[in-house]
């Protein structure tokens, strides 16, 4: 992916950072890091310490591994908000935390969808994934991935498609400017429930103008219920972290939640509704979301 970007001659060689090659143009930087991304915590602060440049957003260009082995291009936020502080995350990050999702997350997804039938990737699917794995950092982040096995990680067509998406997404930043923010009435969507490939978010974030925050699958919302009916478990912590981090990515906007209701048991839904009501967070369906995007 990175080589495909460099091949477009948009980015020029710059000064190595931490001994690793870097490239630059306008306000965009490309950093070739050795090894795995997942355990590289605080890359934003490390970059700033070495260059003096404050990091606005981090897009990780990465491989994606899946047991299914199906060829796919995926994008997702990062974090492990559902883990207790005494748990060791199996794939990086800091337990009970999540960086803000990239404010460009929905735009990345919408741009990727344009290439769903691209002849360069006839065998590939495209999809969002829910929030998962590390690394940890303060700046917003998203992973842009090629999956799902060694047979497809080096696929030239997939790398070219991602290069197209990134250059289109960052065209203003490559020229030294900034992409204008969307209308102020548009809320940030957080989704709760469903499976790993975020079917609800795939649909809702595809709409023009949509903004997307964290997405938590059922496996990241662990519920427990006592014999007396009281509900506990790290699900509430995970929800709070996802909401707060999504708001941090879009500090002037409202955050709304959409639930995959059928994926929860009745008592889990009630606990979620009560918790979100206590936080004054609106729960919406797809029709309401469309109305919100249309404007007041």
Regions found by a protein language model. Give the residues of each.
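N-terminal catalytic or cofactor-binding beta/alpha core of small enzyme domains
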Residues: 1-138, 149-150, 156-160, 167-201, ...
């Amino acid at each position: 992916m990175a080589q495909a970007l460099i091949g477009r001659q948009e980015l020029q060689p710059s000064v190595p950072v931490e001994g690793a090659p870097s490239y630059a143009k306008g306000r965009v930087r490309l950093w070739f890091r050795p090894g795995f991304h997942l355990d590289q915590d605080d890359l934003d602060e490390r970059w700033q310490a070495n260059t003096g440049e404050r990091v606005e957003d981090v897009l990780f260009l990465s491989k994606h591994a899946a047991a299914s082995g199906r060829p796919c291009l995926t994008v997702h936020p990062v974090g492990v908000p559902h883990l207790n502080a005494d748990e060791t995350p199996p794939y990086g990050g800091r337990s009970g935390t999540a960086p803000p999702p990239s404010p460009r997350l929905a735009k990345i997804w919408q741009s990727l969808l344009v290439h769903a039938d691209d002849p360069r990737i006839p065998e590939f699917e495209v999809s969002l994934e829910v929030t998962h794995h590390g690394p940890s950092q303060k700046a917003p982040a998203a992973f842009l991935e090629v999956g799902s096995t060694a047979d497809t990680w080096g696929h030239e067509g997939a790398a070219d498609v991602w290069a197209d998406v990134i250059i289109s997404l960052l065209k203003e930043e490559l020229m030294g400017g900034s992409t204008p923010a969307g209308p102020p009435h548009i809320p940030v969507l957080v989704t709760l429930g469903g499976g790993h490939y975020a079917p609800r978010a795939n649909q809702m974030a595809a709409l023009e103008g949509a903004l997307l925050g964290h997405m938590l699958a059922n496996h990241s919302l662990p519920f427990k219920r006592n014999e007396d009916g009281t509900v506990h478990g790290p699900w509430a912590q995970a929800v709070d972290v996802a909401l707060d981090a999504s708001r941090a990515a879009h500090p002037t906007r409202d955050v709304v939640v959409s639930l995959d209701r059928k994926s929860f048991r009745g008592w889990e839904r009630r606990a979620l509704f009560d918790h979100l009501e206590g936080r004054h967070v609106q729960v919406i369906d797809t029709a309401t979301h469309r109305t919100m995007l249309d404007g007041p």
